[in-house]
A protein has these predicted regions:
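Contiguous alpha-helical scaffold segments within structured protein domains
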Residues: 1-107, 176-179
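Conserved hydrophobic core element of enzyme catalytic domains
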Residues: 71-180
Length: 180
């Protein structure tokens, strides 16, 4: 599943639905979603008998955020272990894989080491089956200090103020975990 494009949730169901509808209609968020979905499809197509992706993204609602999601299914031509497949898909466009060369600019522009941010998190069993996702929200704990990480997809129509607000929404999910 490709996840990209986000907005906040609301306790008011009508407002929550409105926010979700705005997200579904957002050209900027749909572009972000399409970039991620196309990359996944392209990687899978090279190794699959067939690949099927939904024509339109759907909403996935979590506790404090909702995302655009494109379900993607594929029948691989030959068995591929979960870690090998993750290696083929990583890094995703969400963390700088596109446009080409963007990932190499990030350390210079950010001026910090991302550590394990954006790595694969999940499980893999002895048969190499598994389920993994990209760690786009994570925390590094060192003694009494917690460094929280979250990010956004930046595309042509991105607004820095809106992207900062989206990052803050994503970080809010981590605060209760590290505050205890």
């Amino acid at each position: 599943m490709a996840l990209a494009g986000s907005t906040r949730r609301s306790a008011d169901p009508a407002v929550d639905d409105h926010l979700g509808e705005q997200l579904l209609r957002s050209a900027k968020d749909r572009e972000e979603q399409a970039i991620v979905a196309r990359r996944i499809e392209r990687v899978l197509r090279d190794r699959a008998v067939w690949v099927a992706a939904a024509d339109e993204p759907v909403l996935v609602r979590m506790a404090n955020i909702q995302h655009l999601a494109t379900p993607i299914r594929a029948q691989l031509a030959e068995p591929v272990g979960a870690l090998d497949l993750a290696g083929l898909l990583h890094p995703t466009p969400a963390v700088g894989a596109e446009p080409a060369g963007a990932a190499s600019m990030i350390p210079e522009l950010e001026g910090m080491d991302r550590g394990w941010y954006a790595g694969a998190v999940g499980w893999v069993d002895a048969a190499e089956d598994g389920e993994l996702c990209v760690a786009l929200r994570c925390a590094l704990l060192r003694g009494e200090v917690a460094r929280l990480y979250a990010g956004v997809g930046v595309v042509r129509d991105s607004d820095p103020v809106a992207e900062l607000a989206e990052t803050e929404i994503k970080l809010e999910a981590l605060l209760p975990v590290v505050a205890t």
